Amino acid sequence: MSLGPNVPRGTMPTKSQEQALGPGFVQLTKFADILAQDGVRLGLIGPREVERIWDRHILNCAALTELTEDGQSIIDIGSGAGLPGIVLAILKPNSKVTLIEPMQRRTDFLTQAKADLGLTNVEIIRGRAEGQKVTAQIVTSRAVAPLDKLLAWSWPLVQKGGKVLAIKGEKAQEELENAQKVTSLLKDSPATITTCGLALDLSVTVVQISKR
């Protein structure tokens, strides 16, 4: 199999990570190359990120598959370069994935990436998350906004029985504490901090809130 020409081979996933990704690995390799070319050209990721596309971006997003099931509907808000939305669409081919992104330049990139990857399970909406009528079982985000704002945008889009999955970093607990005014309004839906990515030899911090 030929690997993406623009991603340094030294940064490719390990054999065990490749196996964990399953059949989606081939398309993820294509997506990595799209990010390394058009993503950099359009300023969606920095040139220095090319060597870290897999571990910092694609694998980081792929860890969310541990918290989702194939076939569940997904909304990715502030989708940007398709992280995690495009990654989840590849790894969960039976899930309808809606990417919400307000910037034209980014939606143009997402539209082209969708076409290049042949993703029939992706819908792209140009606009802000606030006021959208679409809903889903899972609402994801990554590096979009502080948790209090993020929950205000995400919660109306989550179907009953669904959940918010927000990829966060080392300050997840601090953000959760700062968002208490918002989380206190969610009644019987406590927020928890989850670590996922074990199958990918990663540790990814996710704030998870289920809508009961």
Q: Which sequence ranges carry the predicted segments?
A:
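Class I SAM-dependent transferase core
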Residues: 1-75, 91, 105-122
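Conserved beta-strand/loop positions that form the S-adenosyl-L-methionine
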Residues: 77-79
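Helix-to-beta-strand junctions that scaffold the AdoMet/dcAdoMet cofactor pocket
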Residues: 92, 158-160
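Short beta-strand element of Class I
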Residues: 94-100
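Active-site capping/gating segments
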Residues: 98, 171-212
